[in-house]
């Protein structure tokens, strides 16, 4: 359960599978509620599940910040996490 009323800044770290697609969908919903959202994707875009691809394309069309996690932007990810109110892990799902 997340208290979206009392939190403004969100970082969502998503994988490229279906759980990651759920995270990208969450980013869309939080943005629609006026929240500041940054998305960090772990994995290769070309390996995204269909669910992730659909939500990724919607995020791009909405101009929501999406970043591919690599060695060059790890410090940016760390900085964003420190400034956020909530970090959501959408890398791995349950099996």
Where are these predicted regions, by residue range?
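N-terminal glycine-/serine-/threonine-rich phosphate-binding loop
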Residues: 1
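Glycine-rich phosphate/dinucleotide-binding loop and adjoining beta-alpha-beta core of small-molecule
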Residues: 4-13, 18-95
